[in-house]
């Protein structure tokens, strides 16, 4: 199933963003349920790649569970975080404030947050023209 205005998914190793072809410019990056099941380096790689490939006024959309003010928003998210860290100590539910610090280093600012079902969030980061 193909849409004319949406590119096919790109498989990328965000822990090695310098190895990714950055010749194309995109309007957005859609990232769903990745930040918490990846090394922190992948979050940094995501915004590094976004800086190189997203057009001015483009955005990065993140979906998944996040902490607010470095605290879990529910007991189920806290338990989920523990389970993730047992599987891999470099995984875990991230604080949105930590993600915001990384995004800002690469010229992206948090524009909007939406609470979603099952204690998840949609976070939209836009690329500042000054980045």
Regions found by a protein language model. Give the residues of each.
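S-adenosyl-L-methionine
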Residues: 1-21
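A short acidic, Gly/Pro-enriched loop at the edge of an enzyme's catalytic core
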Residues: 19-29
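Residues lining the SAM
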Residues: 27, 31-35, 63
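Mobile active-site "lid"/loop adjacent to the S-adenosyl-L-methionine
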Residues: 37, 68-77
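A short, conserved alpha-helix within the catalytic core of class I
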Residues: 37-53
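Conserved beta-strand signature within the Rossmann-like core of class I S-adenosyl-L-methionine
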Residues: 56-69
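Conserved Class I S-adenosyl-L-methionine
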Residues: 73-97
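Core SAM-dependent methyltransferase catalytic element
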Residues: 106-131
């Amino acid at each position: 199933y193909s849409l004319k205005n949406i590119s096919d998914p790109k498989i990328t190793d965000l822990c090695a963003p310098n190895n990714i072809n950055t010749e194309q410019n995109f309007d957005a990056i859609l990232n769903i349920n990745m930040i918490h099941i990846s090394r922190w380096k992948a979050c940094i790689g995501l915004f590094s790649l976004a800086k190189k490939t997203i057009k001015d006024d483009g955005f990065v959309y993140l979906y998944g569970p996040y902490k607010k003010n470095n605290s879990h928003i529910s007991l189920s998210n806290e338990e989920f975080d523990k389970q993730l860290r047992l599987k891999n100590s470099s995984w875990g539910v991230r604080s949105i404030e930590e993600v915001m610090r990384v995004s800002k280093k690469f010229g992206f600012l948090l524009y909007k947050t939406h609470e979603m079902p099952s204690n998840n969030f949609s976070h939209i980061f836009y690329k500042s023209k000054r980045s």
